[in-house]
A protein has these predicted regions:
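Bacterial N-terminal signal peptides
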Residues: 1-3
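N-terminal propeptides/leader regions of secreted preproproteins
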Residues: 6-118
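Generic detector of low-complexity/intrinsically disordered segments
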Residues: 5-6, 37-39, 43, 64, ...
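Mature secreted bioactive peptide module from preproproteins
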Residues: 90-224
Length: 224
């Protein structure tokens, strides 16, 4: 005799679905070729109101002669709650790619390193246009040639909040696997008013001789 087993969370999931309508949903892009292509093209899927409320950009300590910088943002999910609140989930990625002839997303030139920092974040926009946001998590990766030695990968995320102390989380990957995404949990699950916080993801590849390759993905809030 076959018994039908209904998980305990099924009723709650159905209840949650009744409370909101999913307007859009996509799988997060992590394929290196597709992600690098989108970054080179500057693909930005933020809604117009979020574009007005935020700037997304990449930073690095490397000089312009040492690295090219790229950003891209993917819309992961959009839903509407019964009270009219719109919830949008995004993945913004910053890429710093060492300059060199013939470099690409998968096959880097000798001695080049490409580092990625991704911020996964959520925006809530109420019917009266009040906005709040927070980090879901961050992801970090380095791609490099077989001739390159990466001693460790330093990961950090941060919320710079004008009302409270900065919330941050970090860890170091001592044994790095080339091309692997490493996930860092959010420093807090709290959502902040739009004008009170900025979101950051940092990736630093530590190289021999005290050298490093780094990139920061910054989601900076504007005042409308």
């Amino acid at each position: 005799m076959t018994l039908l087993y209904v998980p305990a969370f099924a009723a709650e999931t159905e209840k949650e679905q009744m409370q909101s309508t999913v307007l859009f949903q996509a799988n997060q892009i992590d394929d290196p070729n597709m992600l690098m292509l989108r970054a080179e093209l500057g693909v930005d899927e933020r809604s117009e109101i979020v574009k007005q409320a935020t700037n997304v950009f990449a930073e690095t300590d490397l000089s312009k002669e040492q690295a090219d910088l790229y950003t891209t943002t993917q819309l992961i999910r959009r839903e509407r709650k019964t009270d009219g609140t719109i919830v949008e989930e995004y993945a913004s990625v910053a890429v710093a790619r060492s300059t060199g002839t013939g470099s690409s997303s998968d096959q880097e030139t000798e001695n080049s390193v490409t580092v990625y920092a991704m911020v996964n974040y959520k925006y809530e926009i109420s019917s009266d246009l009040n906005m709040s946001f927070g980090i879901s998590n961050t992801k970090h990766r380095a791609i490099y040639a077989s001739s390159v030695t990466v001693n460790s990968l330093y990961l950090k995320n941060e919320i710079d909040n004008s009302y409270e102390q900065v919330a941050s989380n970090s860890r170091t990957i001592s044994s790095v696997t080339m091309g692997t995404w490493y996930t860092l949990s959010a420093p807090t699950s709290k959502l902040y008013p739009k004008a009170s916080a900025n979101l950051y993801a940092f990736t630093t590849a530590k190289l021999p001789g005290g050298n490093e390759a780094n990139v920061r993905c910054v989601v900076y809030c504007n005042s409308l």
